[in-house]
Amino acid sequence: MPKLGMQSIRRRQLIDATLEAINEVGMHDATIAQIARRAGVSTGIISHYFRDKNGLLEATMRDITSQLRDAVLNRLHALPQGSAEQRLQAIVGGNFDETQVSSAAMKAWLAFWASSMHQPMLYRLQQVSSRRLLSNLVSEFRRELPREQAQEAGYGLAALIDGLWLRAALSGKPLDKTRANSLTRHFITQHLPTD
């Protein structure tokens, strides 16, 4: 008889082991056996909880996107009366949260983006994540700008966030959060009306 609560513990172990494997050997070279060994479980446990490697990869990406959503929402909830500028910076901060810029998370995101072009479920996850970012940004810009300008500014800031993140991921160095925050703050203030 399974122990109560073991499913969530096992799932967490396997997702963490998947991130470690992707960080070390990449998504394509990470095998079920390697992941199971890292998690200290049998390969049958992976099949039991996730069907196969693709199911585990999907769960891992859902976990990372959930962490991203939580990082953004936690910052926004802390600013219920915040200005558009403050709330936009909160969204930026959530996207540059440690859960999103650790070496393992960055490599997983890169592999996820590449795989999403060929796997429909990963593509849907990628689209949801991308639309959520754009929607959040446009919504905040819309507080101060006409719809069309808010959409342009939101699209531009999303591209800047993704570009800064991608440059850091491909450099193999940690994201320079000070520089990233400075550049995004400059973009935001350029697009919002002055008092």
Swiss-Prot record:
Record key words, sorted: DNA-binding, Repressor, Transcription, Transcription regulation
Pathway of action: Amine and polyamine biosynthesis; betaine biosynthesis via choline pathway [regulation]
SUPFAM superfamilies: Homeodomain-like, Tetracyclin repressor-like, C-terminal domain
GO biological process, one term: response to osmotic stress
Keyword Transcription appears in the UniProt entry: yes
Knockout-associated phenotype: In cells lacking this gene, expression of the bet promoters is stimulated by osmotic stress but not by choline.
UniProt superkingdom: Bacteria
DNA-binding region: 31-50
The HTH tetR-type domain, residue ranges: 8-68
Induction behaviour: Negatively autoregulated.
Statement: the UniProt record of this protein carries the keyword Calcium: no
UniProt GO molecular function: DNA binding; DNA-binding transcription factor activity; transcription cis-regulatory region binding
Positions of transmembrane segments: none
Record function comment: Repressor involved in the biosynthesis of the osmoprotectant glycine betaine. It represses transcription of the choline transporter BetT and the genes of BetAB involved in the synthesis of glycine betaine.
Remarks, miscellaneous: BetI is an unusual repressor because it remains bound to DNA during induction.
HAMAP family according to UniProt: HTH_type_BetI (MF_00768)
NCBIfam families, per database record: betaine_BetI, PRK00767.1
Name of the protein in question: HTH-type transcriptional regulator BetI
Lineage: Bacteria, Pseudomonadati, Pseudomonadota, Gammaproteobacteria, Enterobacterales
Gene name of this polypeptide: betI
